[in-house]
Amino acid sequence: MNKTNLDLLKLIKQQDIQNQRELAELSGYSLGLVNRELKRLRELELVDAKFNLTSKAKTLFKKNKPKNAVILAAGFGMRMVPINTETPKGLLEVKKEPLIERLIKQLQAVGITDITVVVGFMKEQYEYLMDDYQVKLAVNRDYATKNNFYSLQCVAGILGNTYIVPCDLWCKESPFDTDELYSWYLLGQEEVEQSFFRVNKKQEIITSDKRGKGNRPYGICYLTEKDAKAVAKQLNAAAAEERHEKSFWEVTLEDENRKYTVYPKLMDDSTIFEINTYEQLRELDKSSSHLETDALQQISKALGVTRDEIVNIEVLKKGMTNRSFLFTCKGQKYIMRIPGEGTDHLINRKEEADVYHVLEGKQICDDVVYMNPDNGYKITAYLDGARSCDSTNKEDLQRCMAKLREFHQSKLKVKHTFDPFKQIEFYQSLWNGQSSFYKDHAEVQKKILGLKSFVEKYKAE
């Protein structure tokens, strides 16, 4: 059997079909193709001459009927800055309804009551769903370092006639159904310019490492019992492999030729929205309560602008602990830093603010527009064309050393002392006896501590 005749069989079950022409109109397939595939269905003894399902067909529907669903909601949603500092992305409200609640209701509407939500980041905020919607929660404790491959591996044992659903989608029309006959992966109908996915004429999903013309993937998938077992086997076998730490679970659907082992399900792109960024949420629902974050209010107040004048918000990956983002306001680019959780124990924000106050107007660092010493929020003007020093470039090093000497000779002073070696001891004390994640830590530490006597000798200068 193939996708075409299975689609026709499903239509025959769900619609009162009188003739082939009606079946062609409803399916979108040509009349010639419908006639050919209908003949095949009758040869397989699945449909009789009057478009009635046989007992064999009813058994097939029963075998593949949806049983449960898994909603993936463990990740940070890093691109959702600044919203993700307050709310996990599954709970973002669109049209006064959290995304995940809408998905749960759509699943329940087709009879799916066995729903498991895989949580991680801000997992406590999802707990109310257990009481309100009788869903189950599974925890991915590695959500901070690993991708959703591990989220699905957490629930590999329950996969079988299962919908797998990302939590960051808003679907105008439900993509779920009471009947399914084959495994599928959801993509948009519209051809887009930049995609790693393409549906070919054979109704196959082909993936590529390079972006090109193709279809937009939406992440929703249905797995029959047979295909779910194959996926679960791969998830469990590969879970311990480091190469999959950043993998999406969909790699388990690819064969050796980068072709998916499941069929495509195409949906009108105008009826489904993936919300990965603040801008996408604003585009879908300008009145969403989650657009009013503390960070955006701080920007509005500091720059004297309205929320709508803050545009082109873009996450910045740089920084070990901070959640920073780039934005534009009235043609000027800025960076806002939102300190990561727990960093107030590592950095004295009031001392940091004192340093920036002393540096103000000296053209030594970035231009600080706003700084809050209580919560560490900082807005700076974006430096276009700036780059880090190339430690392998002699000319770069000479310029940097000259700048450091100039800075040192300016003899700027603050009211506190920063002892780098004591800070190193303090940071390492937070490990509670555990060794460093970095293999060359001991070697680097030896080199740094080797400078201590030199620094101590000249620090008075």
Predicted feature locations:
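Conserved core of the sugar-phosphate nucleotidyltransferase
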Residues: 7, 172-244, 249-252
